[in-house]
UniProtKB/Swiss-Prot annotation:
Protein's name in the database: BAG family molecular chaperone regulator 1
Domain BAG: 259-339
Region (Disordered): 1-113
One Gene Ontology CC term in the entry: cytoplasm
GO biological process, alphabetically ordered: apoptotic process; chaperone cofactor-dependent protein refolding; negative regulation of apoptotic process; negative regulation of motor neuron apoptotic process; neuron differentiation; positive regulation of Schwann cell differentiation; positive regulation of smooth muscle cell apoptotic process; protein localization to mitochondrion
PTM (free text): Ubiquitinated; mediated by SIAH1 or SIAH2 and leading to its subsequent proteasomal degradation.
Xref: CDD domains: Ubl_BAG1 (cd01812)
One of the record's GO molecular function terms: protein-folding chaperone binding
Keyword match Secreted: no
Reported tissue expression: Expressed in the CA1 region of the hippocampus (at protein level). Expressed in the uterus (at protein level).
Phylogenetic placement of the source organism: Eukaryota, Metazoa, Chordata, Craniata, Vertebrata
Length: 358
């Protein structure tokens, strides 16, 4: 230390320093030349060159001559390509892991969303199914109620009846025992609404007179709202009484006609040989007596009809009486035919020498 920098003075006796003296020019030029020469060398050899130039091998730091070692910036060693690749691969691995985790998270979230959606859809489907079943049940119940109502309520038909200048809106319902309304039901309803008795009525539908009382209205082509025209006058008490008499006589004619039909059948059995020959004579005598009583009954009916005096204004009564007389005359003619056959069979038995009871 004494050789390099001389003797050190004690700190307490330090004298004020004077201005720093520069080194001689020759020495400065030498350092500059050294530095210039040293610039072309690598950093590992620069210190030795500098020492050789100064004439001794020592460190320049702290030299008494005041020469300082120039500071050299420490260069950052560039990363090698292998380290960069490793870092890049690590970053790629990290980014891939993040991407995978994100994908897994997204997949899990999507799966959860799909499960929730599936549950909601299943719930909605169940609700819709339940609602449809309830609707079907209600519809079936309503249909059953409608069917029961239709079965309980008989079919009806609305008809518009016109009489002179009057109009009647009627609702025809079938009577007990009929599945649908017939002409008889319509005529009775017209009688109640208009006051025209059924015998005096003439109902016309589409230009045709409704005469058959047992014909269903649907068979005539009648539908709801159809129009029916009524021709006839309201009842006359006197004529109504005459009509009642004629009706009673008509019932008697029907009964007598039924009796005549039975006699005609018995005669047919005898003619076909269904009865034994020994019994035929007695049966023929009995038939002869019955046919004569039947003829007498028809004659009495004709007499009662003839005794009825009907004014000319009783057109319906007069027409009914005329038709009844014709009917009785037809039955009388049939009685004459039966009586004639009885006589022929009796003569045939007599010709075969069969004794007839007295």
């Amino acid at each position: 230390m004494a050789d390099r920098g001389g003797a050190r003075r004690p700190r307490g006796d330090q004298e004020p320093l004077g201005p720093r003296l520069r080194a001689p020019r020759s020495a400065r030029e030498t350092r500059q030349s050294e530095s210039r020469a040293e610039r072309g060398l690598p950093p590992s050899q620069r210190s030795s060159v500098r020492s050789a130039a100064s004439g001794h091998d020592r460190s320049t730091r702290g030299a008494a001559s005041g020469a300082c070692k120039p500071r050299v910036k420490k260069k950052v060693r560039p990363r090698s390509s292998q380290s960069e690749k490793v870092a890049h691969s690590k970053e790629l691995t990290r980014s891939k892991k993040l991407t995978r985790s994100k994908k897994v998270t997204g997949t899990q979230e999507a799966t959860q969303v799909e499960e929730v959606t599936t549950i909601e859809e299943a719930t909605q489907t169940e609700e819709i199914t339940v609602a449809e079943e309830v609707t079907q049940t209600e519809n079936m119940a309503q249909t059953e109620e409608m069917v029961q109502t239709e079965e309980m309520e008989p079919p009806t038909l609305s008809v518009v009846v016109t009489h002179s200048n009057e109009r009647y809106d009627l609702l025809v319902t079938p009577q007990q025992g009929n599945s649908e309304p017939i002409v008889q039901d319509l005529a009775q309803l017209v009688e109640e609404a208009t006051g025209v008795p059924l015998p005096f009525q003439k109902l016309i539908f589409k230009g045709k007179s409704l005469k058959e009382m047992e014909t269903p209205l649907s068979a005539l082509g009648m539908q709801n709202g159809c129009r029916v025209m009524l021709i006839g006058e309201k009842s006359n008490p006197e004529e109504e009484a005459e009509l009642k008499k004629l009706k009673d006589l008509e019932v008697s004619v029907e009964k007598t006609a039924n009796h005549l039909e039975e006699l005609n059948k018995e005669l047919s059995d005898i003619q076909q040989g269904f009865l034994a020959k020994e019994l035929q004579a007695e049966a023929l005598c009995r038939l002869d007596r019955k046919i004569k009583a039947t003829i007498e009954q028809f004659m009495k009916i004709l007499e009662e009809i003839d005794t009825m005096v009907l004014p000319e204004n009783f057109k319906d009564s007069r027409l009914k009486r005329k038709n009844l007389v014709k009917k009785v005359q037809v039955f009388l003619a049939e009685c004459d035919t039966v009586e004639q056959y009885i006589c022929q069979e009796t003569e045939r038995l007599q010709s075969t020498n069969l004794a007839l009871p007295e």
